[in-house]
Amino acid sequence: MKRSEKAAVIEAIKAKADKASFAVLTDFKGMTVEELTNLRGSLRKAGGEYLVVKNTLARIALTDGTHDVIKDKFRENIGVAFGFDDPVAVAKALSDFAKQSKLFELRCASLDGKALEVAQIDALAKLPGREQLLGHLLGTMNAVPTNFVSLFANVLRGLLYALKGIEEQKSNAA
């Protein structure tokens, strides 16, 4: 690989790393191209991307960036998964894939500049996703006006029954 090609690869990795809030190092030794393609597809759906790069180029690209804390972990066959939107979705996709494939291993991760171990990645994968949390938040926010309307309707219903009772008393008295 020529020096200019190396510089282009470093810049591409650096650009992706700067955009990503989450980076996971994985061991992919012995995996087939088809398995890696399936992994890339599931990560794409989760808002992530998977790269297989030379370790020295990745170390250079991650130096002085958000994911600087994991740059020294590049050894042997390491792939990098970047998460751009929802780290939980990417962690779930990687964790699920690791359970399916005996050859695929999670090594470590960086979340907003903080190093994570495998157990922490698995814990992150068990959290509810962004969509679930937003749905729960909207449900909670919707509960207050719904309860208010229900309470107001009950008060009005009670008032109507009271007025109806008074009307019946007056019609019986007359």
UniProtKB/Swiss-Prot annotation:
PANTHER family the record matches: 39S RIBOSOMAL PROTEIN L10, MITOCHONDRIAL (PTHR11560)
Keyword list, A-Z: Ribonucleoprotein, Ribosomal protein, RNA-binding, rRNA-binding
NCBIfam families assigned to the protein according to its UniProt record, in alphabetical order: PRK00099.1-1
Assembly and interaction partners: Part of the ribosomal stalk of the 50S ribosomal subunit. The N-terminus interacts with L11 and the large rRNA to form the base of the stalk. The C-terminus forms an elongated spine to which L12 dimers bind in a sequential fashion forming a multimeric L10(L12)X complex.
Family: Belongs to the universal ribosomal protein uL10 family.
Gene Ontology CC, one term: large ribosomal subunit
HAMAP family: Ribosomal_uL10
The protein, known as: Large ribosomal subunit protein uL10
Gene (name only): rplJ
InterPro entries xrefs: Ribosomal_uL10, Ribosomal_uL10-like_sf, Ribosomal_uL10_bac, Ribosomal_uL10_bac_type, Ribosomal_uL10_CS_bac
CDD domains on file: Ribosomal_L10
GO terms for biological process, alphabetical: translation
Ribonucleoprotein listed as a keyword: yes
GO MF annotations in UniProt: large ribosomal subunit rRNA binding; structural constituent of ribosome
Protein purpose: Forms part of the ribosomal stalk, playing a central role in the interaction of the ribosome with GTP-bound translation factors.
Gene3D superfamilies to which the protein is assigned, alphabetical: 3.30.70.1730, 6.10.250.290
Keyword Ribonucleoprotein: yes
SUPFAM superfamilies to which the protein is assigned, alphabetical: Ribosomal protein L10-like
